[in-house]
UniProtKB/Swiss-Prot annotation:
Annotated InterPro entries: Ribosomal_uS7, Ribosomal_uS7_bac/org-type, Ribosomal_uS7_CS, Ribosomal_uS7_dom, Ribosomal_uS7_dom_sf
GO cellular component labels: small ribosomal subunit
Pfam family, one: Ribosomal_S7
Molecular function as annotated in GO: rRNA binding; structural constituent of ribosome; tRNA binding
The organism's place on the tree of life at top rank: Bacteria
Function: One of the primary rRNA binding proteins, it binds directly to 16S rRNA where it nucleates assembly of the head domain of the 30S subunit. Is located at the subunit interface close to the decoding center, probably blocks exit of the E-site tRNA.
Species name: Beijerinckia indica subsp. indica (strain ATCC 9039 / DSM 1715 / NCIMB 8712)
Protein name: Small ribosomal subunit protein uS7
Assembly: Part of the 30S ribosomal subunit. Contacts proteins S9 and S11.
Family: Belongs to the universal ribosomal protein uS7 family.
Keyword list, A-Z: Ribonucleoprotein, Ribosomal protein, RNA-binding, rRNA-binding, tRNA-binding
């Protein structure tokens, strides 16, 4: 990896229906093989189910789910004198968002519902209510950081 220039961030175009940039990033993460129309159909279908089940604005449920899943602290490996320590560090806001999106999608794909639309809507509703595998992943990450708090002075 070149140290000369850091890659410049590309501008993300907001999605057509809700006009939200974070939702576009979410769709792009769901997308396989560049098939964005399928990813959009999955997300919008899941949002329709969320609206039916919760009687709330689906975008606010989505934002609440992201907030509940996003980690504030994580551990990173640091090698000091032959020993590798798991050092707790704060998570940057961009990485928090990316991790939350990734964990929600992974948890949704791991569910046993019939279609991805059902799985995604169920996982988003669970995450918005502080339940589900994505929230469990965040709690595990925080627990690891808490357990390794003694090594926090090795921060970089």
């Amino acid at each position: 990896m070149s140290r000369r220039h850091s890659a410049e961030k590309r501008e993300v175009i907001p999605d057509a229906k809700y006009g939200d940039i974070i939702l576009t990033k979410f769709m792009n993460s769901i997308m396989y093989d560049g098939k964005k129309s399928i990813a959009e159909a999955i997300v919008y279908g899941a949002f329709d189910i969320i609206e039916q089940k919760s009687h709330n604005e689906p975008l606010s449920v989505f934002k609440q789910a992201l907030d509940n899943v996003a980690p504030s602290i994580e551990v990173r490996s640091r090698r000091v004198g032959g020993a590798t320590y798991q050092v707790p560090v704060e998570v940057r806001s961009e990485r928090r968002q990316a991790l939350a999106i990734r964990w929600i999608i992974t948890a949704a794909r791991g569910r046993n519902d019939k279609t991805m639309i059902d799985r995604l809507s169920a996982e988003l509703l669970d995450a918005a209510n502080n339940r589900g595998n994505a929230v469990k992943k965040r709690e595990d990450t925080h627990r690891m950081a808490e357990a390794n708090r003694a090594f926090s002075h090795y921060r970089w």
